């Protein structure tokens, strides 16, 4: 872990920073006034967070001008009507506010309002001009279709 830098938002739990053994870098987030003020005072960029870790990481990757972004495990839907993997403490089924979207195979799949908002945020973000030269691959096995991504098997991405 000492060789892996940690990018964090100003809203991070403070003990994580105290206990992390490697380098840490603050990401100033859009829409959080104190963070925007801090960034302005130090002439630092602000990043779109989109409400999730994935959307924040995507904005960072785009700003870093990464050649390729590969999404893995990004279902953005309820596979078997679960919101977390089997065996975790947070597995639960929800019905209120759910909606149906198309999955990567063109079939209907259930998702939640927040997951669909993340999906739409990602779709809009990868269509912006600063992401035009990048490749976005969805290597998740299933899940909601993210327009603008190419569907590929993870082993193909790794070994090609």
Residue ranges with predicted function:
Residues 1-160:
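Metal-ion/cofactor- or nucleotide/acyl-coenzyme-handling active-site neighborhoods
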């Amino acid at each position: 872990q000492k060789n892996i830098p940690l990018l964090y938002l100003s809203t991070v739990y403070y003990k994580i920073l105290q206990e992390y053994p490697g380098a840490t870098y603050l990401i100033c987030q859009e829409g959080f006034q104190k963070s925007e003020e801090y960034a302005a005072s130090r002439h630092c960029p602000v990043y779109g967070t989109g409400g999730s870790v994935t959307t924040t990481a995507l904005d960072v990757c785009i700003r870093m001008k990464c050649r390729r972004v590969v999404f893995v495990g990004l279902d953005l839907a309820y596979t078997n009507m679960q919101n977390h993997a089997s065996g975790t403490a947070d597995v639960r089924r929800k019905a209120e506010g759910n909606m149906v979207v198309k999955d990567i195979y063109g079939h209907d799949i259930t998702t939640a309002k927040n997951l669909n908002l993340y999906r739409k945020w990602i779709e809009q973000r990868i269509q912006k001009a600063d992401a035009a030269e990048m490749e976005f691959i969805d290597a998740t096995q299933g899940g909601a279709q993210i327009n603008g991504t190419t569907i590929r098997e993870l082993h193909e991405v790794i070994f090609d």
